[in-house]
Amino acid sequence: MAEAKALPRFKKLYQDNIRKALLEEFKYDNEMQIPRITKVVLNMGVGEATGDSKKPAVAAEDLAMIAGQKAVVTRARNSIATFKLREGMPIGAKVTLRQDRMYEFLDRLITIALPRVRDFRGLNPKSFDGRGNYAMGIKEHIVFPEINYDKVDQIWGMDIIVCTTAKTDDEARSFLRAFNFPFRQ
């Protein structure tokens, strides 16, 4: 008989507590109006890729270890002569997380990775895009426990975008605050 797969901690938190709290706070007419996280996108741009084409592949490996899912190498859409960049050159890596992997990543990000960031004073509460999505940047990818610090030859930054179905920034802010996102006061 197949074992029942354990529900990720953040998904259980969302289903049991956050949905009810948001329904009371914003007084939605329909349960489908309650915001939910649709996806989390991790992006790592590698600026030195123009000089060494192997760097985006290494960044993709690191990103795959962080996300638990294979990363896609991104390529330049058009040529820029001042950056010595040609169309089609590999310049970074990205991963889109959905469903359980997304909740597991957010759990690791908030409970383990963000507290390990040097001089961390909280996330910027103004980094919403006006449509309920939140974007943040991390300067060092070594804050994640999956990355072995001794084997890293170069430290890269990364962008993390949390896409939600919230209609406004205020809805999204209180929604993410319920997940214990450490926003600055």
Curated annotation (Swiss-Prot):
Record has DNA damage as a keyword: no
Name of the gene this protein is made from: rplE
Cellular component annotations (GO), alphabetically ordered: ribonucleoprotein complex; ribosome
NCBIfam families associated with the record: PRK00010.1 (NF000585)
Annotated source species: Brucella abortus (strain 2308)
Subunit structure: Part of the 50S ribosomal subunit; part of the 5S rRNA/L5/L18/L25 subcomplex. Contacts the 5S rRNA and the P site tRNA. Forms a bridge to the 30S subunit in the 70S ribosome.
UniProt keywords, alphabetically: Ribonucleoprotein, Ribosomal protein, RNA-binding, rRNA-binding, tRNA-binding
BP term (GO), one: translation
Disulfide-linked positions: none
Pfam families in UniProt: Ribosomal_L5 (PF00281), Ribosomal_L5_C (PF00673)
GO molecular function terms noted in the UniProt entry: rRNA binding; structural constituent of ribosome; tRNA binding
Family from the record: Belongs to the universal ribosomal protein uL5 family.
Its biological purpose: This is one of the proteins that bind and probably mediate the attachment of the 5S RNA into the large ribosomal subunit, where it forms part of the central protuberance. In the 70S ribosome it contacts protein S13 of the 30S subunit (bridge B1b), connecting the 2 subunits; this bridge is implicated in subunit movement. Contacts the P site tRNA; the 5S rRNA and some of its associated proteins might help stabilize positioning of ribosome-bound tRNAs.
PANTHER family: 60S RIBOSOMAL PROTEIN L11-RELATED (PTHR11994)
Protein known as: Large ribosomal subunit protein uL5
